[in-house]
């Protein structure tokens, strides 16, 4: 019997206030995500063969998208700019088997923007995606989450 394709969870988003009233973003540090596909280890020579390996750092990905949207990325929090600064936090929410015969895994992520001065939650989004590697899945999910937040009206 064939197994049906698993569906990705829909992207969810909650926006309390527009992010566009802020000029700066401080991104909490993230580690790199590395993923491989089609890789096998030979029992003969104990070496890794074939496939594609990709690495991404979520902070770098988010920085690029936010700079395109006109934000200035701060290397550290500046006490003189707190009223105009968002703090971005990123986390992974887990992995699920999706796809034909469960040969694919999705990665879920969550992004939160908080006011640097008050710590109030300004916006958050959860997204999930499935790429050819875990690094691709994370990259696609970040794009979906940020798109969901920034597609909200600029009130």
How should these model regions be labeled?
Residues 46, 63-136, 140-143:
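Surface-exposed short loop/turn segments
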Residues 1-69, 154-155:
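A structural "domain/chain start" motif
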Residues 140-155:
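Short, solvent-exposed cationic patches
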């Amino acid at each position: 019997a064939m197994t049906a394709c698993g569906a990705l969870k829909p992207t969810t988003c909650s926006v309390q206030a527009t992010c566009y009233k802020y000029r700066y973003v401080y991104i909490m540090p993230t580690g790199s995500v590395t993923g491989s596909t089609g890789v096998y280890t030979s029992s003969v020579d104990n070496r890794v063969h074939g496939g594609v390996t990709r690495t991404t750092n979520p902070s770098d990905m988010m920085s690029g998208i936010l700079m395109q949207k006109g934000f200035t990325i701060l290397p550290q929090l500046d006490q003189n700019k707190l009223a105009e600064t968002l703090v971005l936090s990123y986390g992974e929410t887990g992995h699920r088997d999706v796809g034909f015969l469960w040969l694919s895994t999705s990665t879920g992520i969550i992004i939160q923007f908080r006011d640097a001065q008050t710590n109030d939650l300004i916006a958050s989004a959860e997204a999930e995606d499935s790429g050819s590697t875990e690094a691709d899945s994370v990259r696609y999910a970040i794009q979906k989450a940020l798109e969901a937040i920034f597609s909200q009206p600029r009130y």
